[in-house]
Amino acid sequence: MAHTLYDRTIAFASICQAVKLVQLVAQNGNCDREILEACLNSITVTNPSNTIEIYGNESNLRLGLETLSQEIDSSPTGSEITRYLVSVMALERKLSGRRDSMGQLGDRIDVIIRQKDHFDLLDDQMVSNLASIYLDIISPLGPRIQVTGAPAHLQQQQVQHKVRALLLAAVRGAVLWRQVGGKRRHLIFGRKQMVEQAKILLARC
């Protein structure tokens, strides 16, 4: 994987998109199906030749690029996004230090890839299968991520499955962030550059 500003921006936008969808699903009970599918499909792309191949094209990350450039701020919505981002990246750091968990994750994703030949990725059972990977392997690694939203939606099992599947997609994005050389200093000192890059990409989406 190339270690460029472009690649870091794509990787970080992918995390932003997944956690933004978590927020939308928790608040509204649903979200755009195409964006959801692009997000969840990224989990199954395990041997890409370049960064953008994981998401198909830049347009599939439009929501993430918008979130990166406009919504990481001190507003209530922005603060919630930031909290999810910090939690997901902390979980990924725990995951990267656990070879056993990484092995289990790879095995479970291989099963999903085989199932994709027979089932639509957005089928309830497939989303449930992705959610169970998060619940079984990722969630035990660190403090539980507290997702806030409308209780009427969050009590629905289907919504819970979508949220967990999206958190798995967010962790996948955090793994990519590490693979393209993303470090904490890039978030502290290089965020302005990423925002500028995101705006350039949005202009051509």
UniProtKB/Swiss-Prot annotation:
Membrane topology: Peripheral membrane protein
Family: Belongs to the HflD family.
Keyword Cell inner membrane: yes
Keywords: Cell inner membrane, Cell membrane, Cytoplasm, Membrane
InterPro entries per the UniProt record, alphabetical: HflD, HflD-like_sf
Record has Cell membrane as a keyword: yes
Location in the cell: Cytoplasm; Cell inner membrane
Identification of the protein by name: High frequency lysogenization protein HflD homolog
Annotated PANTHER family: HIGH FREQUENCY LYSOGENIZATION PROTEIN HFLD
Recorded GO CC terms: cytoplasm; plasma membrane
Gene3D superfamilies in the record: HflD-like
SUPFAM superfamilies tied to this protein: YcfC-like (SSF101322)
